Amino acid sequence: MKNIKKNQVMNLGPNSKLLKEYKSQLIELNIEQFEAGIGLILGDAYIRSRDEGKTYCMQFEWKNKAYMDHVCLLYDQWVLSPPHKKERVNHLGNLVITWGAQTFKHQAFNKLANLFIVNNKKTIPNNLVENYLTPMSLAYWFMDDGGKWDYNKNSTNKSIVLNTQSFTFEEVEYLVKGLRNKFQLNCYVKINKNKPIIYIDSMSYLIFYNLIKPYLIPQMMYKLPNTISSETFLK
């Protein structure tokens, strides 16, 4: 079979023979794409099927363009269109700009979908962290939907939060238990507007930071507590 390059199919229609041949030569996600995908789906990324579960695609939408570009590069062979700009006015009357992108549908994404999707709904299996979450997954989960607990610029609080409001209390307890057992993180469930979030205590900050540091990109440094400077990060 001839080796078809991505740039040969980027502007072709979905029924193009060449595009179908390009997709057929792709077999599975590489290990980085799989591990990062777990973290992204724990965050705000969607994994969806348009053909009743035969194939899946991943969909992304974020405010941070640099992060979007980074993720699209990570999934480069699966993303055929550049990120597109979205504008909307929120309930306060302010303009909100985000960037959207998606992969094409493919059976390679079924492995991720099988971990999360039950009856077309994103769910958390009780063994997800212990069996599948890696430091790379944790880093993308944090970059996607985590941050420091205290955004006061003078704060010395090193606590971290992972936003899990879209999951049930039971599912978040699964995640907390897994983070404690696998990574020895001192964390627990907090309630934010009647929804569960994961709070990682300051005493576990260095453990957490050392786990995710190899995978963080500089543009997401602002999410870290003030005790870690960009100079330290770039060393």
From Swiss-Prot:
GO CC annotation, single: mitochondrion
Q: What is this protein called?
A: Intron-encoded endonuclease I-SceI
Keyword field: Endonuclease, Hydrolase, Intron homing, Mitochondrion, mRNA processing, mRNA splicing, Nuclease
Q: Which Gene3D superfamilies match?
A: Homing endonucleases
The source's superkingdom equals: Eukaryota
Q: Which family would the database say this protein is a member of?
A: Belongs to the LAGLIDADG endonuclease family.
PANTHER family, alphabetized: PENTATRICOPEPTIDE REPEAT-CONTAINING PROTEIN OTP51, CHLOROPLASTIC
Q: Which gene encodes it?
A: SCEI
Which cofactors does this gene product need? Answer: Mg(2+)
Lyase keyword on record: no
Q: Any idea of its EC number? A: 3.1.-.-
Its taxonomic path starts at: Eukaryota, Fungi, Dikarya, Ascomycota, Saccharomycotina
pH sensitivity of activity: Optimum pH is 9-10.
Determine if Hydrolase is one of this entry's keywords: yes
Any one GO molecular-function label of the UniProt entry? endonuclease activity
Pfam families in the record: LAGLIDADG_2
Q: Which organism is it from?
A: Saccharomyces cerevisiae (strain ATCC 204508 / S288c)
Q: What class of enzyme is it?
A: hydrolase
Cellular compartments annotated: Mitochondrion
Q: What's this chain's function? A: Mitochondrial DNA endonuclease involved in intron homing. It introduces a specific double-strand break in the DNA of the 21S rRNA gene and thus mediates the insertion of an intron, containing its own coding sequence (group I intron), into an intronless gene. Specifically recognizes and cleaves the sequence 5'-TAGGGATAACAGGGTAAT-3'.
Q: Which residues form the signal peptide?
A: none
